[in-house]
Structure formats: C-alpha cells, structure tokens
Amino acid sequence: MSASAGAGFASSETDVAVVGGGAAGLYVALRAAEQGARVTLVSRKPLAESASYWAQGGLAAALAPDDSPARHADDTLNAGRGLCRAAAVEALTRHAAAAVAELRERGVRFDTDRNGGLSLALEGGHSARRIVHAGGAQTGRAITGRLAELVAANPGVEVLEETSAVALWSDGSRCAGVVTEAGAIGARATVLATGGGAALWLRTTNPWGAIGAGAVLAHAAGAAVADLEFCQFHPTALALPGDERDGTLLTEALRGEGAKLLDASGSRFTDELAPRDQVTAAILDRIEADHTDHVHLDLRPISPEGFPNVFATCRASGLDPECEPVPVAPAAHYVMGGVVCDLDGRTTLPGLYAVGECACTGLHGANRLASNSLTECFVFGARVSAAAASAMDSGGPVPLPEWRFEPPTEATREAVWRRAGPRRDATGLEELCDDPYPLARMIARAALERRESRGPHRRSDYPSRQPELDGVHFVIGADGSTRRERWT
C-alpha cells in the first residue's frame, strides 16, 4: 500500500481510517462500510463516550409547516456574522430534514408530541421551532448510543477503542494513514472526526478530552487550519461558588421554553433567544456592572418533566431550580474553526478528510447557530463517507513521522481562558503565542490577526466590527504563515 512502517513497528492496512468515536466518526464509519469500504475506527474512549454524547440540544431542521430551508439558512447566516460560506449553509439547510429521517429509519427515537409528530423545540437565533430532540435534553446520548450499536454490528468496521492517535502518517505532501499508540494504520483515506477544542479553555462545557487534537494532528502533518479565533462561549453554564472550572451546560432549549435570565436585582436584562454571542456579551456586561461572577437563570416558568436530567443535575449540585433561580455564566462550548476542508471533507492535504467540529467548511461563520452542529455531522458526514470510500491510493511509500502529539497542560488551559477567553486584547494574546501547545499558539495568532470584534471574538482594543473583514477567513498554512482567504 502507500504507507511504509519501520522495522519492529506494528502496522495494518484498511481502506478508510476514521479517527474519533463521536457522532460524526460513528456515522462516517458506518456509511463508508455500507458502501463496501474496509473501515478501521480509532476511538480514544469507548464508543459513543464523546462530546457528542453530552449534546443536549438536538438537530436543527426545517420540518414545521410554517418553516423552510431558506428560513433556516437566513437564521444561520445571521448568526454567522458575515463569515458563513453560503454553499455550506445551503447544503446543510437543504438536506437537514433528510438527515433526521435517516436517523429515525436507523432506530433513533426522537421525542414526539401528543399527535405522534416530531416535537420541535425553539432555541436562540432560530425564527421557528425546528430543533428535533430526544429524551428532553439527551439527544447526543440517544444518537451516539444507537450509532455505536450499528457500528458494532457491522462486520465491515474494525473498532479500536481506548486507542489514541499520536500522529498522521504523512510526509507533508499526502496522508497515508494514522499512527496510534499501538501501531500504524495505512489507509487510502483518513478521516478526522476528533471533535473540537473547547476544553482547551479552563471553564468549559466540554469533556476534558476535547483539546483540539484533530487540528493539531492535521497541521503538523501539513494541512491548513482556519477561523481558530472563534470559540463560542455558551451563555448558560452552571457557575457554582468556588469552582471556576465547572461548566455544566444548561441547554438553550430551557430558554426556548420560557426560562429567564436575571441580574443581581432579579430583573431581566437581555433577549434570551438572541444568538449565543449576543446573549453571552450581555451576560458578561451585566456581570461586570454588578461586580459579581454570574447571573441567574430562572427555571421556574418551565416544567421539570420536560428536562428531567437538567433539574436532576441542578439538584445534585445543591440547587433547587423549582424554588429559586440558579447561577450561570458563560463557558467555552464550541470552536468554529478547525481543519480547512471542502464540502466533501477534503482538506488541503491529499488523502486526509475532516468532518464534524474538527472541520472548518465555513458553515458556522463566526458564530454557530444553536443545534446546527449535530445536523452538520450527518449532512456532511454522508458526503465525506462517499468521498472517502471511493478514494484511490495515490502514491508510493511514506516514511513514519517522528513527531508525536502531546496533550496540553493545566497551565495552558488556564492561559487560554485568561488570555483568549470571552474578552481579549493584544497583550494577553501575544503572551499566549509562546505557549507550548500548538493549538493555543495558533488561536492566539489568529486572534491577533483579526483586529476587530466579531461574534464571540471580542477584543477590548478593537471593539468594533470592521466591514472590510466580512467574508475574510484567516488561514494558517502548513508552513505556519497566515493568509486571508474568501470562500465561496
């Protein structure tokens, strides 16, 4: 095959190597196997124990009689603050309903209303009810659990659980597979589905493994990355006294059903259903004005039966959401940037594909619309699986790389939160450029280059949005240089 392992190093071959066991990785592995490819799925954790598992919201799809893909697209473009790639938005919104239908056919049980139709929730930034969910706020668990069952039952997929990728098998000109702790896997196509990097910030809603490994692996192998200055901070994560790290997510759907944000005086201060960057900014302004570290989310207007796990989580933290509002503050939630790829997942490095949160197609622009991310996994996952399954071997042997991935330290997480958090400036970002973790440095460089405030990227030294940067993406190439690109 195209890969070449050194003496004494275990190696194997497959058609498609998928790195990541969340929703995107499971789906791509399943679809590629169904198209006749031999698939090896590498998962750092047991199947389905990923960030996708914890997704509370749902899938956004225009299914209601008064809704349409065009309306969904308008909401996505509005949330994206002038940076969405129109072709990606059109692809997602046009095929979202079909993705939901396929998941139902595969056995995912979504919540239904009293008439047996899909129950559609409302979330911030959406102009219509279009969020399909399962178990109230356990959508990720329902989807990844079912996909894991289907993958385990498919003989075309070899699953390597609790196995970490430490490098991509690349010579800088093409990717020939993946290197794991246990050995090297040669592949015609390698698909990164490693999730995002929001756990690189100290206060996060993500599991601690969400450290942006995909972007680091890809860039080290020779692929370009982009839009890394944009990390979405979810407005409503629990803010428990004395615990700066806790970022337990309280789903946006709570506000869609009537939960209210209150300041220190008990007054409402913002539109709870505005896009996330707008709500987060309002909360941060109010926290600063009130000289506190949180605001409150009043859950008393909604029924506990609709969100049993949310109310249980609050009670487990010593809170009584049925009697009094709970403390919340923003936490890092989703990185819009990642590995640059087209709508079929092809990166700038031949042989390497990316899908899900680790990918950067330009779909989300500067600010992701709520619940578009799970939909993205399936709409674009279908395209990526087809492209990867049909990929052809394209060259001779590739030597194993010497570079190996090293995770970030606790000091890096603290530095990223304090210097590239919801509020940032040149001084802090320049300090972060010296961090030992590659992704922290790339985030800082991209944020320094974008001399404006847009979406969740808010610089106190450049507080205004600059119209001349509409549609401009800051891309960091394999050689480390930063360039500006406009994507169509």
Which residues does each predicted region cover?
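An anion/pyrophosphate-binding glycine-rich loop and adjacent beta-alpha core
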Residues: 47, 217, 223-326, 378, ...
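Glycine- and aromatic-enriched mobile tails/lids
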Residues: 3-14, 23, 31, 35-37, ...
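Conserved N-terminal glycine-rich FAD pyrophosphate-binding loop of Rossmann-like flavoproteins
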Residues: 45-77, 81, 245-246
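Conserved redox-cofactor binding core of oxidoreductases
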Residues: 104-181, 193, 237-241, 261
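Core beta-strand elements of the Rossmann-like FAD/NAD(P) dinucleotide-binding domain
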Residues: 12-14, 181-189, 348
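Short beta-strand to alpha-helix junction loop
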Residues: 84-97, 131-149, 160, 205-212, ...
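Glycine-/small-residue-rich beta->alpha transition segments that form the dinucleotide
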Residues: 189, 193-198, 358
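Short beta-strand "acidic-cap" motif of Rossmann-like dinucleotide-binding folds
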Residues: 37-43, 227
